[in-house]
């Protein structure tokens, strides 16, 4: 059977399985390769049941059919599978070896460090308790590795509600869990029940700054941290649903290494963004820095399968945009629509004929007050306040309408196929201030779309949130609210296996999400369980 016919045969076979075919008919190539490399029984059974696939990708070894997953992976990765013009080079960009194979596929060039092929238990229970541990090699110490990865029995459960603490006789599937203990052991123990069910993972792991709580094997501190993170991220990925995502919060010390590690575990194709978060202002820094003052942390955002992930638009409050500087007076006849500068409209609304009258009335206050009054006027009259601007990537039709509007000197309306109407005036498109209005936290406000630079969340005064304190690294509840709302819906499952004082769980609880939190350090009176009890009792400090 020639290769092109085999491509077609395989494509038709895979399209019959909803796991590999989207609603629009496109095949999920990455998932097919992933299932092949992990020898997913469903895929192997499908292939084995087809005589042509059986002949192409299986070898009979004394009556046992052995699947050649590498041959299959190369076949599926070929540019001719699922279309594409012919080229001797592959249809993606990347570093390749002399044989033309990508280094990420051949694994001849990867991020390496001492003890990468080992497992680090990470048994530290107090922040200041330094600990030397053995790196268990997966080949040389399989029994110890199996001991760490085999499911453990959770014990000593207690249930908390508004009536207080209760003994647990039965756990339902909808329970929120706070697990006290080693997070590596906990992740592997959660697999049987929760594999493929978690919608969002957020973690704020030790930053490995040398002064934080990561206290393992100082001689190999960097390697210890990478091994520690790799072991846990690989286990966590198995818990994510196909529509799930992970946010890893970090600072600059390990940013580039954790990014490369996440690329290898979740796939470069599933990286969404690296978000920069402003966490402080220069005013509080008294030490002399060798460079710019460090006020930024980073959140790495990955999906399990980007094609399956459902992105939500998110908005953030902003101040008045001075480009919205005209007030539109609408008449029934669009040819008679007129425009007034917003400053003049604001003055008229206050009973002033000229700005000089306002200056005489308010004196030195006027310069500051004027801007505040214009912003307030725009907010109160958002349906009529507009900006004339150049659209982003206009179509030829839009370009023609803009040119026409400049020539005729009045507003032109254009109804699009979806029923919405666009307006053009003086060579530009009208943007209405009302389109920037959203309701956030119950208040109507001026907004813009969320970007990958987050400076809208205050980190001041968060020490008292939740009624607990954390010496280092406490995160604002509004930060977690932003992440949880943009990636999940009510009743979705959220996981944080570096729970700390419980911010993620507290916010998830308030937003009616289910959650699992894991923490092995003992924070005493500032423990996550204390915080969750406060939330149950109506805490509103976040």
State what each model feature region is:
Residues 1-199, 210-223, 390-400, 410-419:
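DnaQ-like (DEDDh/DEDDy) 3′-5′ exonuclease domain used for proofreading
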Residues 123-124, 190, 211-216, 258-260, ...:
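Short, solvent-exposed loop/turn and secondary-structure capping segments
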Residues 160-192, 461-493, 499:
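Glycine-rich adenosyl-nucleotide cofactor-binding module
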Residues 165-169, 184, 190-245, 253, ...:
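SAM-dependent methyltransferase catalytic-core segment centered on the flexible catalytic loop
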Residues 184, 279-288, 420-442, 469-493:
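Flexible, glycine/threonine-enriched loop-and-boundary segments that flank and lead into catalytic domains
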